[in-house]
Amino acid sequence: MSNPQQLRYSKEHEWLSGAEDGVSTVGITEHAANALGDVVYVQLPEVGDTVTAGETCGELESTKSVSDLYSPVTGEVVEANQDVVDDPSLVNSAPFEGGWLFKVRVAEEPKDLLSADEYTEFSGS
C-alpha cells in the first residue's frame, strides 16, 4: 500500500490535496478503506456547509461498521463527489482517485497534518 507523496494526512485517516486556488480535495486513505471493508453507503457534507478541522462532517457505512468522516481542515464545502454517493465502492477501489469525497475552500489548515512518510509510520501502512 502506497500513500501518495503529494498529499497530506490526518490522524483520523483522511487525506488532503494541495490547495488549488484555495480549494483542496479530501478523501479517506487506503488504510482506512481497507479497515472499513466494503463501503456500501456514504454521507457527505453538502455544498455550502462549513466544516471544521477534526470534527465530523459525514459518515461511511460498510459491511462491517459505520464510521464518522472527519474534516482535516476548516473551510466551506464547494463540491461533494456524487459519483461516490452513487457508487460507494469507489472508496475501496480508488481511494486516492475517483473515490475522493469532497472539495473544500480552505479557511484554516491545522499544523498537525502529516506527510506521506509520517502517515505511513503512524498507520503502519
From Swiss-Prot:
PANTHER family: GLYCINE CLEAVAGE SYSTEM H PROTEIN, GLYCINE CLEAVAGE SYSTEM H PROTEIN-RELATED. Its cofactor is (R)-lipoate. The modification N6-lipoyllysine is found at residue 64. Keywords: Lipoyl. Coiled coil: none annotated. Signal peptide: none annotated. InterPro entries: 2-oxoA_DH_lipoyl-BS (IPR003016), Biotin_lipoyl (IPR000089), GCV_H (IPR002930), GCV_H/Fam206 (IPR033753), GCV_H_sub (IPR017453), Single_hybrid_motif (IPR011053). The lineage of its organism: Bacteria, Bacillati, Actinomycetota, Actinomycetes, Kitasatosporales. One of its GO terms (cellular component) is glycine cleavage complex. The glycine cleavage system is composed of four proteins: P, T, L and H. It holds the Pfam family GCV_H. HAMAP family: GcvH. GO terms for biological process: glycine decarboxylation via glycine cleavage system. Binds 1 lipoyl cofactor covalently. It comes from the Bacteria. Belongs to the GcvH family. This is Glycine cleavage system H protein. Residues 23-105 form the Lipoyl-binding domain. The glycine cleavage system catalyzes the degradation of glycine. The H protein shuttles the methylamine group of glycine from the P protein to the T protein.
